[in-house]
Structures are given as C-alpha cells and as structure tokens.
C-alpha cells in the first residue's frame, strides 16, 4: 500500500469509492491511484447461487484443468469490468484451441524441427527479410498500445493480442516451409531463429497469466 489499483466487486463499488477513501483520508493513509469495479461471473446468464444449484466450484475446476488454464480462460473470455458467462464446456474449448492446438502446436513443431535440423541449437547466422522483421518486431511495435490497454484494465485486449501473435507465428512457419529449404541453410536457419524467437516472446508475454 498505496495500491495502484483497488479492485472490488461492482456491487460494493459505492462503499469502496466513497466511504473507504474517506476513512483513508481521515487516517492520513495514501489513497489508491484507481478504484476499479469488476463484474460478476455468471452461469447460464444468471448470478451463481447455492439455491439455484448453478455454482461452479473453482477448486473442482482447478483439480481437473489446473490453475493456469482457469486463469487464462477467465481473463480471455470475460471482459474485465463486465459480467461474463462461464461453463466447463467453454473452458475446454478455449484451452484446447489456444493453449494445446495453437501454442502447443507451435512449440512442438518448431522445437522438433530445430532439434532435427539445427542440432537442438538456436541458429546464430541470420539474414532477415521483410517478412521475418514484421514477425520479430510485432511486440515492440505494439508495446505502447499494450501498456495503455493494461493500464485501463482492458486485460483481455492483452491476451487477444497474444492469441493473434500465435496465429501469425504458426502461419509464418507454415508459409515459409523450412522443410523445403534444406539446400539453403542460411534461409532455414533464419526461419528457425525467427520462429523460436516468437515462441520466446509469446511465452514471456504469457508468463503473468500462466506462469
């Protein structure tokens, strides 16, 4: 304390944006820089309730899918600040599509190719063309916009940007067809380096969400 963001549920926003700051000022304690009210997590368009029997126990979900998967799903699929519907089926679709098929597939294909054709090493002789540089500069070129969205608690923008980068990295590897470049070692090395560097950057960006 003092907190950059005081995060509370929208149903108690008045108490934490009016009374709580007054208490802090009376006690001469610094105020948070921002108060942000998050929405509710719904089940079937309804607020979860024991009487309705529509509660999803997070501990049960974590036991099956893991904490990282649940955290990823909630951040991606529930727009921060708004109410959001969740279900076990949607969670499975999300983690299978994004983490297994998209991220996992990219990591498996590129590292397996590097192991076979680059002696499991990151190539050090690189000659970049425009397509390579577009991929390598994707995060640095958009860093200011990403920071702005995060500062505004638009967290799902951040994760959707990462998903977009994953699609582009997979497309880049497919389009460049390094398996057809074995007679052009320089080009093969550049493609492998660029793809591995995209995996490194994407993994770094995912770390706050799925450490």
Language model features: what each stretch is:
Residues 90-127, 138-210:
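Helix-rich, typically C-terminal accessory recognition domains appended to large enzymatic cores
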Residues 6, 12-13, 51-55, 63, ...:
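Active-site-proximal structural scaffolding
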Residues 40-128, 133:
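Catalytic adenosine-cofactor/nucleotide-binding cores of aminoacyl-tRNA synthetases and other
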Residues 1-10, 27-34:
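NTP-dependent nucleotidyl-transfer catalytic core
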């Amino acid at each position: 304390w003092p907190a950059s963001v005081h995060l509370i549920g929208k149903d108690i926003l008045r108490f934490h944006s009016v009374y709580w700051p007054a208490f802090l000022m009376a006690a001469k304690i610094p105020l948070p820089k921002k108060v942000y009210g998050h929405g509710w997590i719904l089940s079937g368009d309804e607020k979860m309730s024991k009487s309705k029997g529509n509660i999803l126990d997070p501990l049960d979900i974590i036991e099956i899918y893991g904490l990282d998967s649940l955290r990823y799903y909630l951040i991606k699929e529930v727009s921060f600040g708004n109410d959001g519907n969740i279900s076990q089926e949607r969670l499975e679709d999300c983690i299978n599509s994004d983490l297994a098929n998209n991220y996992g597939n990219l990591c498996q294909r590129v590292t397996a190719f590097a192991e076979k054709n680059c002696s499991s090493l990151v190539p050090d002789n690189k000659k970049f063309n425009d397509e390579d540089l577009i991929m390598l500069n994707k995060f640095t070129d958009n860093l200011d916009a990403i920071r702005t969205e995060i500062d505004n608690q638009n967290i799902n923008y951040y994760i959707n940007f990462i998903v977009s980068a994953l699609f582009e990295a997979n497309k880049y590897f497919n389009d460049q067809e390094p398996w057809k470049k074995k007679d052009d070692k320089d080009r093969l090395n550049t493609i492998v380096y660029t793809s591995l560097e995209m995996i490194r950057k994407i993994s770094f960006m995912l770390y706050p969400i799925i450490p």
